[in-house]
Amino acid sequence: MDFHRFFPAVTALAAFLPAMLRAEPPRPVTFSEDIAPLVFQNCTVCHRPGQIGPFALTDYESVKRRAKQIGEVTGDGTMPPWHADRGVVEYSNDRSLTPPQIALIADWVAAGTPEGDPAKTPALPLFPEGWQMGKPDLAATMPEAYLVPAEGKDIYRKFVIPLNLDQDRWVKGVEFRPGDPKVVHHILYYLDTTGKAREYDARDPAPGFRGMGQSNGEFRYLGGWDLGSQPTELPYGLRWFIPKGADLVVQINYHPNGRETTDQSSVGFHFSDEPTARPWSIIPVPPHFGMMQGIDIPAGAKEHLEEASFVIPEDCEAFAVNAHAHYLGKRMEMRATFKDGSTRWLLKTSNWDFQWQEDYIFQQPIKLPAGTRLDVLMSYDNSAENPNNPTHPPRRVVWGPFTTDEMGVITLSVMFDTREQKEATHQALRVFLANQVIDRLLEGDDSAMGPLGGGAALPGKAGPAKSLDAARSRLLALDFDKDSKLGPLERIPAIQFILQGSFIKNLGAIGFD
């Protein structure tokens, strides 16, 4: 042994022993210093009086009372609700807990939920009363309450709300307040500058008028709200535009819950004196909630896949992404493939939850050069083992407006440098949708074609078979080589035919004008 090296090491260790023995033991995990900051920041926004959380988490006693449950739902990732896979994409509004934070809660529960020094408990964040974004510049409320029955299928109803604007306005934020959040599932906003919505409303004796989607393309799509959506101001100086004299048309999807109730929802607008900093829009893949995707899920299918791709024709920057499906949705994924072959995730969620649909806002805008391909994969579980399956035993499920039907779309919010880039992207989306319409017509499956005929937007109503058959015959007449398909050259006049007719118009506008 080299004693010259051994003894200096022993001497050094001996010098440190007194300090090691005097070291403070680890501080126990307490509510005041460790748990309260996590709960107040990540949970209380929903778990407070008047919000969607079923109970409040606003102080030590309320959190202690639910401590075991909190430990369980944070441990399995159920709460806080955040369904994008961790570590794949960075989002600025990520409210999920990190593994160390989850372990901290588990340690606190295991230790018996000690409070610690109450003086060290942080103050609750300042939450606005009523409107989550603060008092709006304009609060628009449904003129009349609508009676929602206790039982029955989903209801799609449009309500006209006059805005009475005497000048054009730019809008930086919109907040929807459901009158009865227990029955309001999701909504779509439209603007009507034609007066048609008032005419439709006047013809219907009940408040509002029946319908899903746009009525013959008269209304301009503005946006929407789903369960789980949190209102936020548009980022990067972006704005919505509302022309003077426009009416707001709110399409509400009601889901009867066994109790008769009334709903009189409101929409709050926050105005901006500045116009939008850049043109912007949305890229839905596939368009219009997947209506022309041909979604057809066999009974018992454990993992039914639907895929769609769209090539972006112009340079743009993505700033947010959102997914939509119904109860059978399982995985929702969007990936960008660049022209050099490299790829980048935009959304990857392996645990889709119908009850929580929100915008995922990128930490930084993502540049998507012209020629970037957006690849979407949507997975559905129609097996008896799916606890969310609304039908037992499982049945075949196709596209439809009701929650027991299915939909599927991933929507990317993007910014452009010029309006010409934006319009070119809209036109590419119209062509994409026209190709899907052609595919469905040639397949002869009209299960999701009702709205194309101008009067059969909902199942059970007599379908426009004559117009669909006529359109199908017109397409087959373009099959010059008689192979029962339309090749690339044959599709050129077919696409022109679809775009010039009422088919795309009846499906509504693509993006924002």
Segment roles from a protein language model:
Residues 21-165, 173, 177, 245-251:
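Aromatic- and Gly/Pro-enriched helix-to-coil junctions and flexible linker segments
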Residues 30, 56, 233, 474-477:
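Conserved beta-strand positions that form and line the central face of beta-propeller blades
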Residues 1-5:
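N-terminal secretory signal peptides that target proteins for export/translocation
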Residues 429-513:
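Calcium-binding acidic motifs and repeat modules
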Residues 45, 114-117, 257-259, 499-505:
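Secretory-pathway/luminal and periplasmic proteins that interact with or process carbohydrate-rich
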Residues 8-22:
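Bacterial N-terminal signal peptides
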Residues 81, 86-91, 121-170, 175-317, ...:
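Beta-strand-centric surfaces of beta-sandwich/beta-rich domains
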Residues 50, 61, 254, 338, ...:
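A mature extracytoplasmic/lumenal domain signature
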